[in-house]
Amino acid sequence: MESMPVAPSTDPRVARLIDANLDRAREGLRVIEDWCRFGLDRQDLVVPLKDWRQQLGQLHHDRYRQARSTATDSAAGLGHPAQDTRTDSVAIVKANASRVQEALRVIEEFARNGDAVLARTAAAVRYALYDHEVRILEACGHSRRKQQLEDARLCLITDPGADDGCERLVQRVEAALQSGVSLVQYRRKHGSDGLRLQEAQQLAQLCHEHNALFIVNDRIDLALLVNADGVHLGQEDLPYREARRLLGSAKLIGRSTHKLAQLHEAQEQGADYVGVGPVFATATKADRHPAGLSWVKEACEAARIPWFAIGGITATTLPRVREAGAQRVAVVSAIMASEDPASASRQLLDLLT
């Protein structure tokens, strides 16, 4: 890369300041880089960070290092209470991105007249990091959601009837969430888009208050409007690539599968999870012939991503589904049609542990 001798500075304090901020910027980049490498397993996010760190390292000339004097730094060891509030990876990434951006701005200002190459490099890296931070945070959001998905054992799918109002739906979902359900898929086949939007908004807020995932069935527009955690698509819905382009990289995409070829296709395309079914006959999919427990056994052997057995599963039939290899199930009527959705949820969760 381009480099040049650094002209002597009449003020050694500037060299010391630049040294401190080069250390700050490179250390912050390394923190973010290591999370992208080990936490997100995203080489595409690691490469630019490593390159920027190397660029700054090559411009960290001896004259700056020789001006270092931590023993006389009046602010050495000075902390701030906000540092103790970084309790998760996202907070750490944000804090270190800000740290790098601030350090680069300081370098840019003070190096402009004495080290033009360093000043230009600092400015270029700073602007590039603004956009790169967004990509990293999107990846963090997807990683967090995928972990929640891995942990989920029971998915509640709503299927309110044409006469069911929003209040009753919300009450039943809330009872399930309070009982431990951690994944809700909103599906309404009857009703206006206005009603769907109203229900989806309330359910999304409710799920996020309970730290549960909220997925919208079919409707990418609704999912985006209510900031859902993702969408679930049937075999006749939008192709995965187009859905991902609309949703962005941070959201989850699930796909219904009814045979092995569809499961393989969903995995190859990048789906985050799949539904496997219908296992038994079900009123919600009356036109589809049950695939049976043999399909569950096939999925158990072939799936490399989280999958949920679905279709006619109740507390009575769940043990057979578990014996076939399913660790996760999705239900509709077993909870939504129950007189006591809270107890029904607890019973199903107990059978899944």
Swiss-Prot record:
<protein>
    <recommendedName>
        <fullName>Thiamine-phosphate synthase</fullName>
        <ecNumber>2.5.1.3</ecNumber>
    </recommendedName>
</protein>
<keyword id="KW-0784">Thiamine biosynthesis</keyword>
<dbReference type="GO" id="GO:0009229">
    <property type="term" value="P:thiamine diphosphate biosynthetic process"/>
</dbReference>
<keyword id="KW-0460">Magnesium</keyword>
<comment type="function">
    <text>Condenses 4-methyl-5-(beta-hydroxyethyl)thiazole monophosphate (THZ-P) and 2-methyl-4-amino-5-hydroxymethyl pyrimidine pyrophosphate (HMP-PP) to form thiamine monophosphate (TMP).</text>
</comment>
<dbReference type="Pfam" id="PF17792">
    <property type="entry name" value="ThiD2"/>
</dbReference>
<keyword id="KW-0479">Metal-binding</keyword>
<dbReference type="GO" id="GO:0009228">
    <property type="term" value="P:thiamine biosynthetic process"/>
</dbReference>
<feature type="binding site">
    <location>
        <begin position="332"/>
        <end position="333"/>
    </location>
    <ligand>
        <name>2-[(2R,5Z)-2-carboxy-4-methylthiazol-5(2H)-ylidene]ethyl phosphate</name>
    </ligand>
</feature>
<keyword id="KW-0808">Transferase</keyword>
<feature type="binding site">
    <location>
        <position position="237"/>
    </location>
    <ligand>
        <name>Mg(2+)</name>
    </ligand>
</feature>
<dbReference type="InterPro" id="IPR036206">
    <property type="entry name" value="ThiamineP_synth_sf"/>
</dbReference>
<dbReference type="InterPro" id="IPR013785">
    <property type="entry name" value="Aldolase_TIM"/>
</dbReference>
<feature type="binding site">
    <location>
        <position position="312"/>
    </location>
    <ligand>
        <name>2-[(2R,5Z)-2-carboxy-4-methylthiazol-5(2H)-ylidene]ethyl phosphate</name>
    </ligand>
</feature>
<dbReference type="GO" id="GO:0005737">
    <property type="term" value="C:cytoplasm"/>
</dbReference>
<feature type="binding site">
    <location>
        <begin position="185"/>
        <end position="189"/>
    </location>
    <ligand>
        <name>4-amino-2-methyl-5-(diphosphooxymethyl)pyrimidine</name>
    </ligand>
</feature>
<feature type="binding site">
    <location>
        <position position="217"/>
    </location>
    <ligand>
        <name>4-amino-2-methyl-5-(diphosphooxymethyl)pyrimidine</name>
    </ligand>
</feature>
<dbReference type="InterPro" id="IPR016229">
    <property type="entry name" value="TMP_synthase_cyanobac_bac"/>
</dbReference>
<comment type="pathway">
    <text>Cofactor biosynthesis; thiamine diphosphate biosynthesis; thiamine phosphate from 4-amino-2-methyl-5-diphosphomethylpyrimidine and 4-methyl-5-(2-phosphoethyl)-thiazole: step 1/1.</text>
</comment>
<feature type="region of interest" description="Unknown">
    <location>
        <begin position="1"/>
        <end position="128"/>
    </location>
</feature>
<feature type="binding site">
    <location>
        <position position="285"/>
    </location>
    <ligand>
        <name>4-amino-2-methyl-5-(diphosphooxymethyl)pyrimidine</name>
    </ligand>
</feature>
<dbReference type="InterPro" id="IPR034291">
    <property type="entry name" value="TMP_synthase"/>
</dbReference>
<dbReference type="Pfam" id="PF02581">
    <property type="entry name" value="TMP-TENI"/>
</dbReference>
<comment type="similarity">
    <text>Belongs to the thiamine-phosphate synthase family.</text>
</comment>
<dbReference type="InterPro" id="IPR022998">
    <property type="entry name" value="ThiamineP_synth_TenI"/>
</dbReference>
<feature type="binding site">
    <location>
        <begin position="282"/>
        <end position="284"/>
    </location>
    <ligand>
        <name>2-[(2R,5Z)-2-carboxy-4-methylthiazol-5(2H)-ylidene]ethyl phosphate</name>
    </ligand>
</feature>
<dbReference type="InterPro" id="IPR041397">
    <property type="entry name" value="ThiD2"/>
</dbReference>
<feature type="binding site">
    <location>
        <position position="256"/>
    </location>
    <ligand>
        <name>4-amino-2-methyl-5-(diphosphooxymethyl)pyrimidine</name>
    </ligand>
</feature>
<feature type="binding site">
    <location>
        <position position="218"/>
    </location>
    <ligand>
        <name>Mg(2+)</name>
    </ligand>
</feature>
<feature type="region of interest" description="Thiamine-phosphate synthase">
    <location>
        <begin position="129"/>
        <end position="353"/>
    </location>
</feature>
<dbReference type="GO" id="GO:0000287">
    <property type="term" value="F:magnesium ion binding"/>
</dbReference>
<dbReference type="GO" id="GO:0004789">
    <property type="term" value="F:thiamine-phosphate diphosphorylase activity"/>
</dbReference>
